[in-house]
Amino acid sequence: MAGTPDASMEEILWRSPPHVQMMGGYLHSNNILFYFAESPFFDPTSNNASLAIQANYNEAFRHFVETREAFEGRLKTMQGLEFVVSYDPIQAAAQPDGRFAHEPSNIWVIRKQNRRKRTGLDDEVAVLSTYFIVGDCIYMAPSVASVVGNRILSAVTSLTSLLKTASTLPTFTPSHGHTYMPPALKQADASQPGTQSQQSKENTPLPDADAAGKASLVGSSQMVGAGSSLQDTRTLAESFNLLRRYGDEFMDEHPLVGEPGSFILSRVNDTDRTSAAKPPATAAKVGTPQVRVDTPGKVSEKGATPSGSEENKMRKKKTKVGS
């Protein structure tokens, strides 16, 4: 049994116009196998070669090479490696009345097979390889393993190039993890309860929005190397602008109110009502406490009127001095 065909034979195209001219100028059913015998695909140890040599030196075998039917009929009585025509375009288009059902093509199919005789049973035929002839060009049909291997290699090559390109795309953010595209912000639904209280009066930007904006700015600065310094300056100015506009605002659902040491948790609506209803308290004047000391016989500097007991004492003292 012949070995497996060489893989390099699948890449060969063979043609010989001089041999076609020697065989009558065109290929037909009776000379197609002899034209194939001139190609490198032919095996000189096959039954075809031995039968052709016998016909050249033995007149009894001459009629076997005159027609393809007689040649292949003789090959069926032999055991071993052989080449037979699997598809004849002329026979495929011929009809019993001698006319053609369609225009015959110029494609022939030849099989390389091994025949083994079995007593009382049909011959065991194993197909080793297939060849096809288009015009005067002979090709070897690729095996199934070669076709599947080529497709797998093409797929792996494409996946390798894809992974090389995709390896530079992922970005990481604490809120979304590893992503290939910047995360899109979800629009808040005003109809849902609780969303109104979570929104700031001045539309405070969300942390994800700042992260997405900074990520886009960083990506653009890496792509455009010439304008990196200008982009950095613009980013810094935007940061200061956001700090100036929203630096004193918070997104706490229950903000802290009160003085240091006595903070109280309250809701946003309660805080607004309290601040709107309560007028601003005026700061009390802080000064040194005054203590009044009354000296006997001396009137207060501010001219304050003494009390009743003090007036009686003063009168008694004046009476004693007068007496």
Swiss-Prot record:
The keyword Magnesium does not apply. Residues 172-213, 271-323 are annotated as: Disordered. One of its GO terms (cellular component) is mediator complex. Keywords: Activator, Nucleus, Transcription, Transcription regulation. Residues 314-323 have a biased composition (Basic residues). Transmembrane segments: none annotated. This is Mediator of RNA polymerase II transcription subunit 6. It comes from Aspergillus niger (strain ATCC MYA-4892 / CBS 513.88 / FGSC A1513). The lineage of its organism: Eukaryota, Fungi, Dikarya, Ascomycota, Pezizomycotina.
